[in-house]
Amino acid sequence: MDLSSWFEFTMYDAVFLVVVLGFFFYWLTRSEQPLPAPPKELAPLPMSDMTVEELRKYDGVKNEHILFGLNGTIYDVTRGKGFYGPGKAYGTLAGHDATRALGTMDQNAVSSEWDDHTGISADEQETANEWETQFKFKYLTVGRLVKNSSEKADYGNRKSFVRGAESLDSIINGGDEGTKKDN
């Protein structure tokens, strides 16, 4: 084997060299594009009971926070704005009581008025309960959805939180954290 056989240049060598040089050129000239900034974290809302009218302004358009009611509890689903934000899959639920819509799996079933959920079947209520089980472990609990302002509870300076298995009633009635307003 002489030295000239080591320096033979074939078509395969040419293709390989072009590919390697192409990658090298790309690596040298690529622009360093910064990663997109993570979405800004909004401060948790203070705990507060709301009427349907008050809840409506938290639809992701009028306010950056996205809230909706489910089984009488208000959840801050802002971190799920890819699902619940304006124009998204469940965007029609934002700012409303979503119990009937999630129970019936019909997004058009949201109401702009107080809904006492009469007419929901046991199966539909069970479906709504399953949604709530997921929400209370994933999203911040803001308070309760009440029919009128006289039913609101005072939570002091408490911020909304992920409550998990903790009952909202135990928070309202427990210790000095929450007392019923006298209006």
Curated annotation (Swiss-Prot):
SMART domains: Cyt-b5. GO terms for biological process: innate immune response; nervous system development. Expressed in the AVG pioneer midline neuron and in several nerve ring neurons that extend projecting axons into the right ventral nerve cord. One of its GO terms (cellular component) is endomembrane system. Disulfide bonds: none annotated. Gene3D superfamilies: Cytochrome b5-like heme/steroid binding domain. It is found in: Membrane; Cell projection, Axon. The chain crosses the membrane at residues 9-29. Pfam families: Cyt-b5. Residues 47-146 form the Cytochrome b5 heme-binding domain. Keywords: Cell projection, Membrane, Neurogenesis, Transmembrane, Transmembrane helix. The cytochrome b5 heme-binding domain lacks the conserved iron-binding His residues at positions 84 and 106. Transmembrane protein required for the axon guidance of a subset of ventral nerve cord-associated interneurons and motor neurons. May function with the netrin receptor unc-40 in axon guidance. This is Protein vem-1. The lineage of its organism: Eukaryota, Metazoa, Ecdysozoa, Nematoda, Chromadorea.
